[in-house]
Amino acid sequence: RRRRKPGPPGVPHPARPALRADWLPLLAVLLIQGALSYHLILSNTAFIDEGTYIYAGYQEIAHLRHGTPVSTYETFFSGSPLIYPVVVAVADFLGGLNGARLLSLAFMLSATVAVHLATRRLHGSLAAFCAAVAFVALGPTQFLGGLATYDAMALAILAWSGYFAVRLTTGGGYPSLVASGLLLALAGATKYAALLWVPVVAGIAVLAGPRGSLRLWEAWRRGLLVLLTFVVAVGAAALAAGEKYVNGFNHTTLKRAPGHDSYSYVASEAARWVGPLLVVALAGVLVQLVRARRRGGAAWPEFWLALLLLLAGLMAPVNQIRIHTWLSLQKHVDFGAWFSCIVVGLVLARTVLWLKGRLHLVAGVAAAALVVGPLAWVGSAQGREMYGEWSNSKEFVAALEPYIVKGEDRYLVENYNVPAYYLRKQTNWQQWHDLVAVFRRDPATGEMQNGVPAIQAGIQAHEWKVVVLDFTQTGAIDKAIQPTLKAAGYRVVTVVTSGKHGRYTVYVAPGYDKRP
């Protein structure tokens, strides 16, 4: 066994427990997490976001390899199209949709390892185990482990940035500092929403460990250096990426248009997913406050750190309450929950040890189980619920496939990304269009049309060979163009029903039929 390099003077290394006492329990947690998410992976076809990102990744790879045209994803994606979409397209090429989803599972498993390691360095093995269990018990954690989107990758990178910030304060040196800052920048580039937790990671570098303090320059220096590394990396990336990426960041994140969901609805949804966890974290913060008031000194940074980690769990709900939208909230809350699980691990571990000293170890374990058990039960049900929110598209894609052929024909399909993903080998991306932001120049007058008038004019000219309506996200547009389809001679070739909400009506233009 190699000897460990000494850390900075006066900063003790955390004790390393025996393998069986530390890693085998974590392995059991990871196996349970893998089983819960893998069950979801097999239960449904591609979600629209999955189809979008994987399909975009194939286009980006073709553009990088052969210079083929590619859509301007950087202007409307909420993360760089050259990071996750490219990575997930490779996974999809190797293992199909399940391979892409297993990549997300690997990322989420690594996030669990990161919360275990970070908590172990701060509070010991028992707290680390409890933190990992709490994180795995969450429905959003299980959901992201089976969903091929930006979120799992960005969360995992953010988690390891947080771990290296902890490591920096507990015996790590400049490599930990650089790793924390660079990973923080990479997480933000992977999914822009991850930037919300930049202050949290910097705060960990200030407050964590035996030399954490709000009064010492050394502590502030650590946080500032992490931020400096982050800023340099992000600045260099922004300069290299160009104006389109900056505009895309502003459009999707910084200046995102507000939604129409009420404060109470967004708050209630967030409470449903992570509310119980945050209540336990709040209890941990209050315990730390009492402890700090009694002991003073070094106990105060521990309280401020616990408070920071609790606030991290509130950041996503507060931000989305601010912009009146619950869209993607079930994914975003898991980013902050990762940090809050460190406090939850601490309070559960102290509960176990307190009851062990006064009653019996069994009492302590039972108390922890009474907290984690309901979390896991509810979380498992929530994971299944989230995974069932979209319709199974297998029958729809099979019904549409005979009418789709690579060439110049154009297809107007509501939420087209899923069929475009499954039928990518027999179409070009330019052939697909959804019912949002349709623009058309009138060939007779040269006038630019947009929205419903543009769609109706295109239908009257039979420019769309296939039109698919499902009366969900663009229901008003669907109803407005339905009479135009009938008047222009389009015929309904099939209606496919899928699940509770999926009902796809497939129209084809006059004279257009199945491919030979």
Predicted segment positions?
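Transmembrane-lumen/periplasm boundary regions of multi-pass, lipid-linked membrane glycan transferases
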Residues: 186, 198-296, 301, 316-327, ...
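Short acidic/glycine- and proline-prone juxtamembrane loop motifs at membrane-interface regions
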Residues: 47, 104, 140-154
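Membrane-proximal lumenal/periplasmic loop motifs of glycosylation machinery
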Residues: 38-48, 64-85, 94-97, 269
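Start-transfer (signal-anchor) and selected internal transmembrane alpha helices
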Residues: 1-38, 222-226, 306
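Membrane-interface transmembrane helices that cradle and orient dolichyl/undecaprenyl
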Residues: 122, 126, 161-177, 187, ...
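Signature aromatic-anchored transmembrane alpha helix within multi-pass, membrane-resident enzymes
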Residues: 26, 226-231, 292-293, 297-305, ...
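Transmembrane alpha-helical segments
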Residues: 194, 318, 322, 347-352, ...
